[in-house]
Amino acid sequence: DIQVVCIEFDEWPGVEGLKPLSEGHIIPEILDKTVIDRMLEIDVIEAYEVSKVLARQGIFVGQSCGAYLLGAKTLAEELKTGHIVTVFNDIGERYFSTSMWD
């Protein structure tokens, strides 16, 4: 069985485009909610910290990718068998103008 798990922040981190889908803000037209089997909320502060750890390891991504990694880790702890696939679709340089890299 394949399951689609949507990772979202538990609260809005202050970066436009990263608002949780459950808050009813702008939902992308390409999002087909019928294919999502589960929504998994990730703590925004933890995601922020994980993205900093990834940057120190040479993977320079944004906060959403920190959330994806945390989500994959959470799912891995729940699974007895299977595979988890995630995509890091963000780059850290988009957030130079924020406090993310201070």
Residue positions per predicted region:
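Short glycine/serine/threonine-rich phosphate/pyrophosphate-binding segments
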Residues: 64-72
